[in-house]
Structure formats: C-alpha cells, structure tokens
C-alpha cells in the first residue's frame, strides 16, 4: 500500500526523535557529509583517523578504514560527496556482464553504471543487478541487445567522499591533507593534485570552511536541468535551434550525450548563446541531429570557501588541479566561524526551473557566520558574487555550533548550540523560525553535523532533518511538516 503523508501544519507539530547515538562524540572540526545517493549514507569524520558511515535505512553506524589525514584535525576540516566512483575500461563482457579491473569491496546492487564509450551500448545508464567482490570484479546488468567488450569504458555511479583536513600554520604540511573515500572500493586515496598528491588549496585551512560538489546524479537518477535533441553539432559545439537560452547561463555546467551520435560523452560547458553550447574540450565524436542530451551539474568540480578569507577555489577531479578563481565581483567580506555553503539545485518555483533563464544549479549560498547576519551568493555560471543579499528579517547571527541543511526551497539553520532552528527560503528571500530542540547540548563547536534524509514511496516524499548535537553523541531528527 502506498504511503500517504497526512501531516498538516498547526495540526501536527514537529517532534524531535532520538536516533542511534554516534560512537564518538562531536569535537571541533567534526562534520557530516551526505552521499546524496539512494541509500543516503552519511560520512561522519571525527578525527584524522576515525570515521563512520551512518545508514539511515537501519539507523546504525559502522566504522570505515582510517583516512590517515595529514594536517591537524581542527576547525576548518570539511568534506563533500560526488556521485561518481571508480571508472575504467572493461577487460571482457557479454550482453549482461562487464568484467572490470576493479577490486570491488561490497555489494553494489541498486547503484548504477554509466557506459561512456567503446562501441556497443554507449551512453546507457544501467542499474547494477549484482557484482562479484574481489579482484577483476564482474558486474551484472539487464541484458542488452549488443555485448559489452574489452573496449567498453564505464564509470560507476557510487558515492565518493572528498575530505580536506585543517592546516593550522602555513608550510606545516602538504601531502595527504586532501583525500577521498571510495565507497565501492572501501579505500582512501590522496586526491591527485599534480606534483604532490593530496595538497590543500590554501596554505592555512582553519576558522571554518566548506567543500561543495555539484553532482549530476542525486538520489536514484540524474538531476537534469534541461534535456533535448540537438539540431546540429560542431567540433566543440552543440546546437538546439529551438532554444532561447540566456547568454552564458550554462557556463560551468556539464552536457552529457544520452543517446544518438556521440552518446556517452560528457563535456564542461564553457559558454552558450541562445541556441548553441560551446564546450571546454572538443568532442571525440561530434553530435548531430540524432544526439539527445542532458544539461546537469558538473561532476568534475569541487568548490572550496572559508578559512576567514574571501578567496574562492575550484578543484578539477579530472585534471587534479586547484584553481584560484577570480570572480568579476569579489565577496565583500570573509565568512567566519559558523559559516555555511550550499549548492541550490532543486528549488521548485517556476522562475528557478525556467530553462531559458535557469537558476537551479547555478548558485552557492553562504551565510557569513560570526561575520554578521549576512548572506552572500556565488554565481557559478558568471563567476561573480552578489554580497549581502536582502532578506527579512536579517537579524540572527549564526556562530560556533551552527549547523545547516539544504533541501528544495529551503536552507535550514540551527543557531549556535541553542537548539533554535530557522529556515531561509531561496525563492522568496525570507527567513523564519522553524523549530526548537529542547535537548541540552554541550559546548558550541565549529563543524557542520546536520544532514537531511528523505523517505520516498511513489509520488510521496517525506523529508527529515537530522543533527548530531554539539559536544555530544546524541543524534536527533525531526520530520519536515
């Protein structure tokens, strides 16, 4: 029987429930990063060596291998999750199996595999029905019309968490500060950064800071901001003559060829006119009038902001490089302790989903924390900041101990260690009270340990906000009514 959500405002009050406590208490710098995949695992990093995954399906924690992070675990440590795990070229295949050179560590059924090239089945994204565990893992999918071969290239749509540890003094450490945990492989790896693996974007990582990914896959499917069929293509262009896009609104998104000529290819969009996308790298196979495409969040980019500075950095996963961005308008002032940063990608208002002037997927919203009751917004497409957005009532200052969650039209914020929750509406630019947790917290500490989980049954979605309390092992959750 389908689930029906009968909760109504006023009639049904929000109530905070106790969940399974975390095995290690929250400390300064501890944070939670959500996978945003269908199992909705949450990575809790409580030190340079101790990390746990929370499984909301079972309300339970499990320790994972040590990340052995260099640096000093402290305020400023942060993390994010991308939607793409390991990739490679098959060593053999049939119409329903792909033999990989990967050493998969766990059952991945329910996750998906995207075929990026190699001939047959290019562009398809298939649920994983089963897989072997161990060396040269074999992945089984639904039977296809053509066989996979040793030329088939693929990427697994499985969680990968990127973690950046704090650096308390310039020059004290470089390597292994920036690492990622691959869920499919159950391994930690220093992120590629050129001459020295695992280096940080800035000389000092501290005060408070955030890593922000912009994944194409959210939950159990791609998050497409636009889709269509090309009318033509060039060496590094894709044309859809029926469109009326605003100039450069798609810059720094990605375009993926879903089917037709060139299927499986993914490129970063460098610019656009009303009808033409220009990519940052040439196509291997030029699209044509048969090419069906999606425009999505960019799987290659991770943004870093914080450390009591206005400087904004961007990491390229494929290139293994940090870039210091030079926004047209710089952020007016540095964020402090209690800052936030959220990529807004699922606002429901028509103005945000309008393909001709897209807003979803375009902005990173950031409260400045102790730097004041101020909210700034970074425009990913135009590489510019809008500082001190007007919103009402802009009175609450979020300091040490503040925690944040983004979901749909709302950014939820718990102030300091007070238990008082607020919500900001990205569509209407309003903030109001949302809830209060009456359970007493410990000392307020920097580090974001709130997250969201949603229950979905057909057309019904029920959202929950979770929070690990300050200096505590207590985990609470409340249903969004």
Could you tell me what each predicted segment is?
Residues 66-69, 79-150, 155-157, 171, ...:
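Autoprocessing Asn-cyclization modules and mimics
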């Amino acid at each position: 029987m389908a689930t029906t959500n009968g909760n109504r405002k006023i009639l049904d009050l929000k109530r905070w429930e106790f969940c399974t406590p975390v095995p290690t208490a929250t400390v300064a710098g501890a944070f939670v990063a959500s996978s945003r995949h269908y199992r909705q695992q949450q990575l809790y990093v409580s030190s340079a060596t101790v990390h746990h995954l929370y499984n909301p399906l079972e309300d339970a924690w499990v320790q994972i291998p040590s990340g052995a992070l260099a640096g000093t675990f402290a305020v400023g440590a942060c993390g994010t999750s991308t939607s793409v795990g390991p990739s490679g070229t098959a060593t053999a295949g049939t119409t329903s199996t792909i033999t990989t050179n990967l050493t998969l560590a766990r059952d991945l059924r329910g996750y998906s595999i995207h075929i990026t090239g190699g001939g047959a089945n290019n562009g398809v994204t298939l649920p994983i029905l089963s897989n072997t565990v161990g060396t040269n893992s074999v992945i089984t999918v639904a039977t296809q019309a053509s066989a996979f071969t040793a030329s088939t290239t693929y990427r697994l749509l499985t969680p990968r968490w990127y973690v950046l540890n704090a650096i308390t003094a310039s020059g004290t450490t470089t390597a292994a500060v920036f690492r990622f945990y691959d869920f499919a492989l159950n391994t930690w790896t220093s992120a590629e950064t050129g001459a020295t693996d695992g280096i940080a974007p800035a000389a000092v990582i501290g005060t408070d800071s955030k890593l922000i990914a912009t994944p194409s896959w959210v939950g159990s499917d791609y998050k497409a901001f636009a889709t269509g069929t090309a009318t033509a293509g060039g060496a590094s262009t894709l044309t859809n003559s029926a469109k009326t896009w605003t100039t450069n609104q798609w810059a720094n998104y990605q375009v993926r060829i879903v089917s037709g000529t060139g299927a499986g290819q993914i490129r970063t969009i460098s610019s656009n006119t009303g009808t033409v996308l220009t990519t940052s790298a040439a196509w291997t196979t030029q699209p044509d009038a048969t090419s069906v495409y999606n425009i999505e969040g960019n799987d290659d980019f991770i943004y870093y902001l914080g450390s009591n500075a206005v400087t904004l950095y961007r990491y390229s996963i494929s290139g293994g490089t940090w870039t210091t961005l030079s926004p047209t308008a710089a952020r007016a002032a540095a964020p402090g302790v209690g800052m936030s940063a959220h990529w807004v990608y699922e606002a429901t208002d028509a103005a945000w989903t309008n393909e001709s002037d897209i807003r979803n997927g375009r902005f990173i919203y950031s409260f400045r924390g102790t730097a004041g009751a101020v909210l700034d917004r970074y425009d990913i497409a135009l590489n510019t900041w809008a500082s001190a957005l007007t919103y009402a009532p802009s009175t609450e200052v979020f300091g040490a101990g503040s925690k944040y969650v983004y979901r749909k039209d709302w950014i939820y914020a718990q102030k300091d260690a007070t238990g008082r929750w607020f919500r900001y509406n990205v569509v209407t630019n309003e903030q109001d009270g949302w809830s209060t947790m009456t359970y007493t917290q410990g000392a307020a500490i920097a580090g974001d340990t709130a997250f969201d989980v949603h229950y979905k049954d057909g057309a019904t979605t029920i959202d929950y906000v979770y929070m690990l309390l300050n200096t505590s092992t207590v985990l609470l959750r409340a249903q969004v009514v």
